[in-house]
C-alpha cells in the first residue's frame, strides 16, 4: 500500500458469486472473499492497487477429487488445468481486469442470477431438491 502500486489476486469460486449447494462453510467463506475483493477494488484502485477476483468453476486439483458434493464434478463445467488458470490470472493482471472467470458459461449464469433473482433462487431450490433425493 505504501508503494501505491501492485496487484492483489483473491481466489474465490463461482460458489461465492452464485452460491453453491452442499457445503455451507465453503459457500459463505467464498462469498466473503468476493465481498473483500470488491471492497478492496473500490477502496484502493485509484491509489494504484489493482484487485482481481478469480472465480473458477473447476480446477484439476486434489480438492476437486475429494469433494463430498453429489454434483460437484458435473457442476464444475469443463475442468481446467492449474497452468491454464494461472495463465488466465496473468492475462487479467496485465489487462487490469477485476473478474477472472474460467468458463464462458459462468458469465451466462451470473447474468441469469442478476436479471431475475427470484427465478434463479427457485431454480437452485429445485436443484437442491434433486440433490436431496439422490441416494
Model-derived regions, located:
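Conserved catalytic-site region of short-chain dehydrogenase/reductase
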Residues: 16-18
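Catalytic tyrosine of NAD(P)H-dependent dehydrogenase/reductases that use a Tyr as the general acid/base
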Residues: 26, 34
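SDR active-site lid
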Residues: 42-105
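Active-site loop immediately N-terminal to the catalytic Tyr-X3-Lys motif
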Residues: 20-24
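Active-site helix of classical SDR
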Residues: 29
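Helix-to-beta-strand junctions that scaffold the AdoMet/dcAdoMet cofactor pocket
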Residues: 1-4, 45
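Residue(s) in the substrate-gating loop at a strand-loop-helix junction
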Residues: 13
Amino acid at each position: 500500500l505504501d508503494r501505491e502500486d501492485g496487484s492483489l489476486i483473491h481466489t474465490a469460486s463461482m460458489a461465492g458469486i452464485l452460491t453453491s449447494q452442499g457445503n455451507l462453510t465453503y459457500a459463505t467463506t467464498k462469498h466473503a472473499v468476493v465481498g473483500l475483493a470488491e471492497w478492496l477494488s473500490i477502496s484502493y484502485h485509484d491509489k494504484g492497487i489493482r484487485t482481481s477476483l478469480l472465480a473458477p468453476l473447476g480446477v484439476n486439483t486434489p480438492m476437486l477429487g475429494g469433494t463430498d458434493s453429489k454434483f460437484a464434478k458435473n457442476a464444475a463445467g469443463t475442468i481446467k488445468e492449474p497452468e491454464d488458470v494461472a495463465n488466465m490470472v496473468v492475462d487479467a493482471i496485465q489487462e487490469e481486469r477485476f473478474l477472472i472467470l474460467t468458463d464462458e458459461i459462468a458469465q451466462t449464469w451470473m447474468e441469469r442470477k442478476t436479471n431475475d433473482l427470484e427465478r434463479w433462487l427457485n431454480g437452485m431450490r429445485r436443484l437442491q431438491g434433486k440433490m436431496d433425493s439422490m441416494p
